[in-house]
Amino acid sequence: MAYPFSTIEPKWQKYWEENKTFKTVEDKNYPKDKRLYILDMFPYPSGDGLHVGHPEGYTATDIYSRFLRMSGYNVLHPMGFDSFGLPAENYAIKTGIHPLITTRKNMETFRKQIKSIGLSYDWDREISTSEESYYKWTQWIFLQLFKKGLAYEKEAPINWCPSCLTGLANEEVKDGKCERCGAQIQRKNLRQWILKITEYAERLLEDLDELDWPESIKIMQKNWIGKSTGAEVDFALVDKDGKETGQKIKVYTTRPDTIFGATYMVLAPEHELVKSITTSNQEKAVAAYIEEAAKKSDLERTDLAKNKTGVFTGAYAINPLTEQKIPVWISDYILISYGTGAIMAVPAHDERDFEFAAQFNLPKIKVVAGAEEWESGKRDFSEEPKACTTEDGYSVNSKQFDGLKTEEAKTKITEHLENLGIAKRAVNYKLRDWIFSRQRYWGEPIPLVHCPSCGIVPLNEHDLPLTLPQVESYAPTGTGESPLAAIDSWVNTKCPKCGKEAKRETNTMPQWAGSCWYYLRFIDPHNNEAFADKEKCDYWMPVDLYVGGTEHAVLHLLYARFWHKVLYDLGLVSTKEPFTRLINQGMITSFAYMRKNKSLVPVDKVKKISETEFEDIETGEKLEQVIAKMSKSLKNVINPDDIIKEYGADTLRLYEMFLGPLEVSKPWNTSGIMGVFRFLEKIWNLSDREIYKTPVNDTSTPETKTLTVLLNKTIKKVTEDTASLNFNTAISQMMIFINEVSKHKKIPHYVWYNFVKLLNPYAPHLAEELWQKMGNDESIAYSHWPMFVEKFCVDQTCTVVVQVNGKLRGKFEAEAGTSKEELERLALSNEGAIRNIEGKEIKKIITVPDKLVNIVVQ
């Protein structure tokens, strides 16, 4: 009989919605260890809707949540939308339609698609970051950051996207290009709001060790934070006669042991001392260089492959340990944002310094000898090195520190510099403060005003939310001002402090702002008095399992950790970290077709010749089938709506989980869906067989014993695999179970009853229908998860090897624990043994219970 998924699935989706089956309340009867918060990274509601990659993570958390509910847990499993962002604004610029209208329309599409997959979210907790009732609290949290001194205004060189016409955080730039649109980034000085994430660098680093996250993500965050230890050293500037001027250049170095090899210094073009130390005859060249450097992104400036450029300032400093006068240069390979924006250049032991010295014919002094070189007895290192060496070794050309190993030399030389009063130990981070403002319309307004008398003043909290005004044009100005700056009626306001004329801040917050804390709003989404009730936060937090893509490693995940720690310091949350466990689902890829020149051909331009042969329809060129990311341009995006229409949501759910382990990327192959559909169809048809009553775990007949053993093994396997998120192997075991059960014309009630429960998290629509078909009035969603009996999970039979004089002659099956005498009898009656002992005298029989019988003959 055909499996009527198109009738069953809407029926149960309607039932769940009308009965609020998955509504969650803070029931204090559940102890803390029986409350679990399972969260998906919420989607941006684009106009394209879902593709089959989205349901992978959503289905995984849904299976796990359904399993946990049946296992006696109170589960919080919500869904919402990260709805501020550039795509909706760009669409508004083209069409004139307000972003809120398109965003709400897109959310409706997403909501409909998500519900059609049968995901057990508590929809009463739905949130949207662009709704005023939500961003009121995003603004409120920003004000707490501002009052705590963690938000400051500064004119700074930023990453400017000439296409999006807005500033970007460092984390939003990939390979010198805008992460969103791919345009080449420019550098531009703009007034910005910046958050002091660097104040939390050490805690963000240390607390990673407490998290059950993929090691690769932790490493990415550690590298981004980039902690290093070293020393800050002062180099005195001198005039042309070698007399100290009173000015000093402070450098940060991780290699104080190499200071004897510092032969010149380099300042970032933006360094505050450049103007004052540049000599008159170098002013023109220095000014031209600074102007050129300002046009480059940090990535361009630090590209290891580019030729080193620079200009001599005309100034000199004194190396404090060699007492030699060394020139001071400026170069764009030094960034003002790292360390002190100045370096002591040691060309013999730093590749960039070596290249710069070679370019400008500056001296190189070797001060570290390799272990092999030193241990060979060589002591003359006066010759200028022809190559740079960066590995540790022994100090040379370093006066009293010669012969010290690198680590000891670092310590001793730092102590010596400290004793001279010109250095101190220091820790540095690559992490930069977060450029928080955007020069766009569709984002949270920053709740501050600029008052001529009072300066920057926060809005009163009772005046939140500060809402976005209606505008005629959503287009960014391109001048660095937000479109909001043109709305005089909105910009002009009264100072909350003195009541005089003032102007609103016109920059808006980045898309990341709303997603920094959304997991907290899910806990208490309708609270008008606080972002979330503290008691409810204590009930649910931290998030026990967070599932999403690796692309958020140093953006959302780092920002959310930062905001959470601020809220923790303010006493507003009780946990130091928001997300205890993180899993990154693998990408679902698709097939693409590649020409010899490595370019890809859209799927609709490909002709399939055979399972392994493909050609370009237009040119006839043979094509290679490859795995690639789904993309609209390649026409290989799969819409889940199409799959659900043809095969059903349960088929989609099972297929995506059956493709392979959750964390591994795997290719979508529509032809593979049919096997999963037939599996569900087989289950449906089995439900029409006779289901008869018999004692639970009946072993009174060979048939019931076989099914009892199979059921208990299946319960154990599916339980363990679901608990460990190994969904593909759990499905495989259920397939084995159904294949065996289908051999039986009638099925014991307890066997079918418990299997339907196992099926429920994976194929909930079908499970609900089968559950009702068995006479149950309530939903299966909160029925008790089946328990297995361990004795039935141990193999009941074993394979016994038969040997004659130590050589394998046969095998037979026997029940585990069969007596020695019975094993010998069975071995002697084995055909292989009979052939090899005929006409011979049996001297002895050696038996290893459950394993082998060796017949010794002569």
From Swiss-Prot:
Q: Where is this motif: 'KMSKS' region?
A: 629-633
Q: Name one GO molecular function term.
A: aminoacyl-tRNA deacylase activity
Q: Tell me, which GO biological process terms does this entry list?
A: leucyl-tRNA aminoacylation
Annotated EC: 6.1.1.4
> What residue intervals hold the motif 'HIGH' region?
43-54
Reply yes or no: does the keyword Protein biosynthesis apply: yes
User: InterPro entries, from UniProt?
Assistant: aa-tRNA-synth_I_CS, aa-tRNA-synth_Ia, Leu-tRNA-ligase, Leu_tRNA-synth_edit, M/V/L/I-tRNA-synth_anticd-bd, Methionyl/Leucyl_tRNA_Synth, Rossmann-like_a/b/a_fold, tRNAsynth_Ia_anticodon-bd
Record SUPFAM superfamilies = Anticodon-binding domain of a subclass of class I aminoacyl-tRNA synthetases, Nucleotidylyl transferase, ValRS/IleRS/LeuRS editing domain
Q: Name one GO cellular component term.
A: cytosol
Q: Which Gene3D superfamilies match?
A: HUPs, Isoleucyl-tRNA Synthetase, Domain 1
PANTHER family linked:
LEUCINE--TRNA LIGASE, MITOCHONDRIAL, LEUCYL-TRNA SYNTHETASE
Q: Which family does it belong to?
A: Belongs to the class-I aminoacyl-tRNA synthetase family.
Supply the name of the protein.
Leucine--tRNA ligase
Tell me the organism: Treponema denticola (strain ATCC 35405 / DSM 14222 / CIP 103919 / JCM 8153 / KCTC 15104)
